[in-house]
Amino acid sequence: MTRFGMTLLCALSVLIVSAEASDLAIEPGQWKVTSTTLMNGAVTPSGVKARCLSPGQAADVAKTFGPVSGTVNSTCEPAESEIAGRVLKWHLLCKGQLDIDVLASFNFDSPSHYTATVSSKGRMAGQLISDVKTEIEGERVGECQQ
């Protein structure tokens, strides 16, 4: 994930997405998450991170992969989310000193693999200051490492 993306996520307070995810569950365990980001037209190096998902996190995909909201000096609308089959989509819109518009689509094509696209645009005083698109692939690689 890019520095802007990390800053964006860290600057936001938690919002739990309201969505029924009874059909949408993935396997708990150790996941390898690879991300490639296009930031303001420039490709950044791919990143690979390990992520351990507990049984609770794996069972509540909407919460685990849902948006975060509540920027400083901006107000976020309640996130819009939708689950259709094995696809989770959400949209987060925040307005204020920094306007942020984030769209995400996660395709959980199996209980041990997913792909996602997260796109965000940041504007200050109406001027586009950040245009970020991140492609993500997650694959379960085994049990969580202690």
Give the residues covered by each predicted segment.
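Short beta-strand segments that buttress and anchor functional surface loops
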Residues: 33-36, 89-95, 117-122
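Short, solvent-exposed loop/hinge segments that bridge or flank secondary-structure elements
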Residues: 34-67, 71
